[in-house]
Amino acid sequence: MTTSSEDVLLQMGEVRYKKGDGTLYVMNERVAWMAEHRDTVTVSHRYADIKTQKISPEGKPKVQLQVVLHDGNTSTFHFVNRQGQAAMLADRDKVKELLQQLLPNFKRKVDKDLEDKNRILVENPNLLQLYKDLVITKVLTSDEFWATHAKDHALKKMGRSQEIGVSGAFLADIKPQTDGCNGLKYNLTSDVIHCIFKTYPAVKRKHFENVPAKMSEAEFWTKFFQSHYFHRDRLTAGTKDIFTECGKIDDQALKAAVQQGAGDPLLDLKKFEDVPLEEGFGSVAGDRNVVNSGNIVHQNMIKRFNQHSIMVLKTCANVTSAPSTMTNGTNNANGPVSQSAYTNGMNGKGQATATATKSSSDQVDKDEPQSKKQRLMEKIHYVDLGDPILEGDDSANGEKAKSKHFELSKVERYLNGPVQNSMYDNHNDPMSLEEVQYKLVRNSESWLNRNVQRTFICSKAAVNALGELSPGGSMMRGFQEQSAGQLVPNDFQRELRHLYLSLSELLKHFWSCFPPTSEELETKLQRMHETLQRFKMAKLVPFENRAMHELSPLRSSLTQHLNQLLRTANSKFATWKERKLRNTR
């Protein structure tokens, strides 16, 4: 099971791994698990490969210990001592405490920068191949590669952080547990608290005002779950309830949202009325003047559901809105802002409310024609008929063009498209009837004057003609691309594709240096020219030598275009160098 140099520090029986019972061994340099009635180790992890260990939360029926490796894999061990839950916890704690002492001695310091670079290379296969072709072959150094050629990928990865949405049932997911004293215990995680703050900014503001100046974190959330704000079915609120103002703020926000509408100018929420199914099975409207006399508790419940749905939808809208958009009357946790920029809450009353409502309605009236036009275009626009041509203002078209953002996940999937067939080329040079008749007459004059004598050519000329008509000959240049695609093996095609990818990346940075108007650009131009020369000697010349031995008819045609690109770059660099020397004299 173990080598002679290993000592078993702890042997723990009745440990289950993947539904199999066995024994867990904690040794000097690794942790191992062996199934019952076996003499071979099933699971073995060296301490240097272990990133961290995790244990199951308290109160869970299963007592588990999980080992997380640096490569992301995990191994979970389930302790199943027959003596009960207390014995399971004791066994788990023994293993956990021993691992806590051993793991720091074998802690492998992993550079976060290296992990990020490795993740970028794994997520971008083309960049990984470029790294292999340029860095491993010593055409470029690793620092130059990451500073120049992989800079865009690194910045894109940093700026691609996506906002996590809010679930509509996040409050229902908070399952209370009894504490044994006629009380309830809520287990709040950081994600749930983030969802509450994001959906109800008024609660976030109250949290900033009261924690930790007036109460602790636990006391605040206890008051939140005991408050009238959380239990909306209560008819009266407590006098000491700190969330009473939050309910009023939400009511004002609900009225403003109903007045503003659902963002669809063709839909009017204020025209919706309750029609019982008994009235003609819902097809015949009843008396519109009759006031709904339903249970007020039910009405408050429906009102609360609508309010919650509006707030969840606003969290999605705030992600794409401008940074200047405020929530709950504050732009951050530091203080209030003006009343005209609120979303869910305000500081003043009365006149401030009217001002905010007026400004909001003015904004709605201002944007209504544009939104109605966009909504109508969505109704009459069909994708298969193409984009409609509108005779509108240029500003609307400009804003529409700016709002389009298209990012390609896999660029190679968009590089292949339909190829035009030369058999169906349209010639736009019509000829008149007189011209056609004239050409027919001239051609028909030579039909009867054909020479019937047969002339034979020598065998040498025939062999030369066959050579010219063979693949690679002068007469087959028009079909060279098609024949080359059929004759070149797959490994050569793959390597040639990698050469084009690497050379295109180098040439992109080479040509971006022109015109070299600064010393920095001149230094980069000189460096890129030297890099191109190293690329030719390290990658292109070995490929040509290999093609010369294995693909004799196509040895010169495969790299002809690559050499032409390099010659053009060298010629441009030589011209710039000569001009620079002439100016310095």
From Swiss-Prot:
Signal peptide: none annotated. Keywords: DNA damage, DNA repair, Nucleus, Repeat, Transcription, Transcription regulation. It is found in: Nucleus. Its main location: nucleus. Residues 104-159, 180-232 form the BSD domain. InterPro entries: BSD_dom (IPR005607), BSD_dom_sf (IPR035925), PH-like_dom_sf (IPR011993), Tfb1/GTF2H1 (IPR027079), TFIIH_BTF_p62_N (IPR013876). Residues 324-374 are annotated as: Disordered. One of its GO terms (biological process) is transcription by RNA polymerase II. Residues 324-362 have a biased composition (Polar residues). GO terms for cellular component: nucleus; transcription factor TFIIH core complex; transcription factor TFIIH holo complex. Component of the general transcription and DNA repair factor IIH (TFIIH) core complex, which is involved in general and transcription-coupled nucleotide excision repair (NER) of damaged DNA and, when complexed to CAK, in RNA transcription by RNA polymerase II. In NER, TFIIH acts by opening DNA around the lesion to allow the excision of the damaged oligonucleotide and its replacement by a new DNA fragment. In transcription, TFIIH has an essential role in transcription initiation. Belongs to the TFB1 family. This is General transcription factor IIH subunit 1.
